[in-house]
Amino acid sequence: MKLSFTKMHGAGNDFVVLDGYTRALPPLTGAQVRALADRHFGIGADQLLLVEKPTVDGADFKYRIFNCDGGEVEHCGNGARCFVKFVRDHGLTGKASVRVEVKHGVITLTMQDNGEVVVDMGAPVFEPARVPFDASGLDGRREGADTLWPLPVNGVTRWISVVSMGNPHAVQIVDDAEAFAVRVDGPAIERDPRFPQRVNAGFMQIVSRHEVNLRVYERGAGETLACGTGACAAVAAGIRRGRLDSPVTVHTHGGTLTISWNGACDERAPLMMAGPATTVFEGVIELPA
């Protein structure tokens, strides 16, 4: 079967986007997702994004996202930005703002006149059981309004914030994000048994109260050039710890995101993420068996 696709990226976090809205797509197996995402024998991507018809009232579209290991995940902020550019560029909507069904609810995406996309990422969740994170038997340490949890990582105790942005994140503050051994500690944190759904590991260097450098080791994808939900989780943790003030410029290897959150006044407030979305190329590929 021939499969039309669009290759896109948001700040270097790249996606294969498939249109299941105007045409019927067969259910994709994990092996097929891995083959399409393979950078040597397939198209190459961190994740695969499906555009579908919504199944809930009040949504214009539905999106599903799969990591390059074939597993379906809850949410991706960079993918959400690419999503709204895709549906507008392909004439599926003329709206500047669209409401999109994701696994954990409905989010609002807005295309700005400058070409950047603003995503209402929803409110962060800090309760360990809802992240989910098993904090049983651990003695947490308070910093500001946050609780830091000790996690043994390769023989060293790391103090982490746990945050859900619809998907789980473990955030730690480091002195130098560029020099930190992300690809050593990242896999150990990702698969720590206290995270029953595995976890995205964020390593944040604070430059000022409005600026950070961030690297994220994503579950099922490894280190990516940018992670939208990871940027939101890191900023939320930093504000809650009293280290950051909104808005925050987040520098990643792939580009810059701007995160705003009024969480110092109301933790139920949504995080707003602004950043680029870029189409790289379009093509047709034979769907692997």
UniProtKB/Swiss-Prot annotation:
Ligand binding (substrate): 13, 47, 67, 77-78, 167, 200, 218-219, 228-229
Gene: dapF
E.C. numbers: 5.1.1.7
Active-site residue list: 76, 227
Reactions catalysed, as given in the entry: (2S,6S)-2,6-diaminopimelate = meso-2,6-diaminopimelate
Biological pathway: Amino-acid biosynthesis; L-lysine biosynthesis via DAP pathway; DL-2,6-diaminopimelate from LL-2,6-diaminopimelate: step 1/1
Sorted UniProt keywords: Amino-acid biosynthesis, Cytoplasm, Isomerase, Lysine biosynthesis
Keyword Oxidoreductase: no
Source species: Burkholderia mallei (strain ATCC 23344)
Molecular-function GO terms, alphabetical: diaminopimelate epimerase activity
Role noted for this protein: Catalyzes the stereoinversion of LL-2,6-diaminopimelate (L,L-DAP) to meso-diaminopimelate (meso-DAP), a precursor of L-lysine and an essential component of the bacterial peptidoglycan.
Compartment(s) where it occurs, according to its Swiss-Prot or TrEMBL record: Cytoplasm
Protein name: Diaminopimelate epimerase
Pfam families registered for this protein in UniProt: DAP_epimerase
Family classification: Belongs to the diaminopimelate epimerase family.
GO biological process, one term: lysine biosynthetic process via diaminopimelate
